[in-house]
Regions:
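Nuclease catalytic cores that cleave nucleic-acid phosphodiester bonds
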Residues: 2-146
């Protein structure tokens, strides 16, 4: 088992490191730059080319069945699931075969609604302590299931 983190704008890198260290699981932090290296030997920083979806492409090509990917990118999560991996969002939501279709459809609907009203105010929810707690519990659950 290996954990991959789609690291751009990911607020749970330290939490992944804590859980992975406890379970002695290697982690790859994939980004197109700007990530501080960890002194922890299980942590590996992978810098990909700049450009849209470069980190996603790397992760999708690298994972094997049983790996876990931390990402908020739903199309990447769908590819992970197709390849036998597990996907978890940084708020603790586990993306599965059963819910990925609905999540993709909702994402597409929301994209269409936002483009229909370019003046609509973006309402990005702040990452909270309860999100962090949900994430830690869900990651622990995924690891124990694997």
């Amino acid at each position: 088992m290996h954990i991959y983190v789609d690291a751009d704008a990911c607020p749970v890198k330290k939490e992944v490191e804590q859980v992975a260290t406890r379970h002695a699981i290697n982690v790859s932090i994939v980004s197109n730059g700007g990530i501080r290296p960890s002194q922890n030997p299980i942590m590996r920083i992978i810098v990909v080319d700049k450009g849209p979806d470069e980190a996603d492409k790397y992760i999708a090509n690298a994972i094997i069945a049983g790996d876990i990917v931390v990402t908020a990118d739903i199309p990447l999560a769908a590819r992970v699931i197709e390849n036998g991996g597990s996907a978890i969002k940084h708020n603790g939501e586990i993306i599965t075969e059963n819910n990925v279709g609905n999540i993709l459809a909702m994402r597409d609907l929301m994209t269409d609604l936002r483009s229909a009203d370019p003046f609509a105010k973006q309402n990005h929810k702040q990452f909270s302590k309860s999100d962090k707690s949900r994430f830690l519990n869900a990651l622990e659950k995924l690891i124990q299931q694997s």
